[in-house]
Amino acid sequence: MADNQGVQKAGDVKIEQLKLISSTNVIYDLTEFLIELNLYEDIFSNYLTGSIVLSDSRNLFDMVPIIGEEYLVLKFITPSFPTSVQKTFRIYKTSDRQVVRDKNTQTYVLHFASIELFYDVLLPLFTPFEGEITDIVGDLFDSYIAENRDFQISEAADEIKEIENVTPLYVKSETANKVKFVSPGWTPFKCINWLASKSIPKDGKAKNFLFFESNKSFCFTSIETLFREAYEDNTSIGKYSISAAGIRQSDNRPDIDREYFLAKDVEMVDTTDHIKNYTNGYLANRLLTLDVYNKEYVVTDYDYINEYGKQYHTSGEGKKAMPIFTGDSLRNPATNISFYPVNPKLFNDFPDNVSEKMKDIYGNRKSSLLDLTNLRMNISVPGRTDVEVGRILYFSYPAVSPSDSSDANETQEDTNYSGYYLITAIRHKVSKMNHTMVMEIVKDSLTTEKTVK
């Protein structure tokens, strides 16, 4: 973390730019109108979204006019931190417009999303692709998504120019399989999502690839890679615990370093539902691959309990991670059956295309992604602009009673719910003076011997 110089309290924020660029290239500073800005990122979303609640006593809505096709230049930073959240977005909708304060002020909400989304939805592709999956993903991104779509605004706010500030794509996991297909009018994002669902990693066992945008970059990776990197490189963002009131140093000043890692409004969203897991394919599932050329079918059963120890999890290596089930847990692959067509003669010069690999991918991917739905929490913490989805944190969930008469409650952890969690979604709530993150965190294993100090 940064040295906190210039930070008065955890959650301090500096909004360096909040500019609206109209369809006629007129610039408006929205900072004085701001009530609250919300920025959303999610590992299951290809792009960022957000909304701004504005209080307008100057009739900006009609003066611009705001019609839902404006650009939003956003930059905010945690004071003394090295990284900021910076991006140019596109306004796509207005809502909740109402007059308040004796008809002298109006409030409304502007909804925005990543600029890349608008180029994506308007670009159906009818194009053939062939090669390594990660190479195709890179080509799709470079050719159709990664263009210069950022703006630089002068301090005098009277000049706009486009700059080379492309949101980068990081491919964290290389794939081992090749694919050949023709896009049937899919957009670039849909093509990449389809490729993610058909990817086999070069390193690792889990076929849980995703394509998403964080507040720093686009990312194409397997979830297992995120777990392995955090575990091997010790890149957890820190140890969080539930907030207690009145935490101060002896000089009665806030302990800012500690308060950054105090969570409040902790909500347990999902816990293990074994009846659901018996039937949704999590513990075991079956795939019927139908060969439309040879008129044959193959039954492939996948048993996650037998495969769990071969993969990395939130707690680290599979052989050290403790699953939420036992080796004797009930399961029957026939409770969850799926079908997939195989056409080995679709391309004469391309054997082992993706359809022939699905028996190795489908069950593994289904189980490992469902593993992220068993233990899920929402926590509210002071905002930091160096945090993004896809990172790992340690959350200390308190035990309700001491282990013996000599122990203090506050030093004990619940062994089931404490441990490493993956940040799957963040809602950044930003006002003029404060930044709060509401984080969705999940784990796919229970506490192991390795702990965070």
Which residue stretches match the model-derived regions?
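Assembly/oligomerization scaffold segments
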Residues: 1-124
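Sec/Tat-exported extracytoplasmic proteins
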Residues: 62, 144, 196-199, 203, ...
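Glycine-rich, acidic and aromatic/proline-enriched surface loops and short helix-turn segments
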Residues: 105-106, 111-118, 130-169
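Second-shell loop/turn segments in exported
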Residues: 121-131, 177-183
